[in-house]
Amino acid sequence: MKPLFVFECDLVEGRQVRCMDINQANPDLVVVGYGEFDINCTDDSKLKPGLLCFWTLKNPNFPEKIINHEASITCCQFSKKAPHLVAVGDSSGNIAIYNIRGNDTKPVAESKDLDFKHTDIVWDIQWVQRENKGESLISISGDGKIIEWSLRKGLEYTELMQLKRETNPNQKDVYAGAEIEKKSGGMTFINTGGLSIDFPQNSEQNITYFAATEDCTIHMCSMSYSEQYLETYSGHTGPIYRVRCNPFWHKDDCPIFLTCSYDWTVRVWSAKEPNPKLTCHQIETLKQQVNDIYWSPNTSSVFASVANDGRIEIWDLKKDNLAPVKTYFDKDSDGKEINTAKTVVRFSRNSPVLLAGSENGKVGVYRTLGLEHVQVSERD
């Protein structure tokens, strides 16, 4: 990997990079969401508001557009059907839609004034094309709710699922925010928080999806059933920060998906097997939570991960599932490793470039060397 340049400006000082997405219609356009987070702060009004910056790979010196947002931004994604729209989720539980055409920086729709909305942090969002419904937005939150938002008339909601805690034999006293009902015989855990959501890209109707939770499990769910899971996957021993489906692999309608966790591991799963197929980590050196993962858009066996000690790793499952093919740390002027936590990672869609955001507000842009492009057979 070779560092090219860094997206940074004075406006993002004191904020962390929390999310990032690349526009499908214009692959040089990158949206980055920023926020200030302090686990010891009980009053969000004392924290800096969120910031949405639109950078381009052709002009890294300053954002093309800047949008101020009331609360810290936790997730963002461009619409696939209307790439001038970008959806945002934040630390207050609000969903907002922005139109980046023109000079207006106010949201065209948002959920904060609705009677029904998320009551906790929105951790992940996904635009999904629904049969006979057009494109809708799906959100998952720490309140345990998964909600579908329609933009036909402002924002209209449909609750898809209230996540319930499942018994996890791998869990070791990690209950992370689950709602508890006290009973005479002890404690019964009812709801659990959701942290990430993704849809297999081969699904014709986009009915099936995967939800990662605070209680260390992943659930395969259907948009047609709100009362039960289709399958539950156990293997992690800490909250699962991200779940991402492989964009190529859909043999026998059996998605392959990745997860990363507080437990220092990245795991590879087959939808037909409730236990992980592979566990990817460096046994001797990786003792840090893995904050994000992202599949390569060009090669079906390649993905990137970033961890809390500042490392960027590139993996190729065809070559090795126990060690990455490349581990990279930023370095200071003296050549020493910089251990600022990396929070987000993305591959560029149209060039051999990787982007990684950090908790110091910087987004590093790197050239990836030696990665092969996908063969036609890998898409089948």
Q: What positions do the PLM features span?
A:
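Acidic and/or Ser/Thr-rich intrinsically disordered tails and linkers
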Residues: M1-G50, F54, K106-A109, E135-S136, ...
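Structural WD40 beta-propeller signal
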Residues: N23-A25, S79-K81, V128-R130, P200-N202, ...
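Conserved, structured regulatory domains from eukaryotic proteins
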Residues: G50-N61, I66, A71-M187, Y294-S296, ...
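Conserved blade-ending motifs and adjacent loop-strand segments that build the rim/top face
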Residues: D115-V122, Y233-R242, K277-Y294, N321-R349, ...
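Loop/turn-rich, solvent-exposed surfaces of beta-rich toroidal or solenoidal domains
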Residues: K251, V268, K287-D320
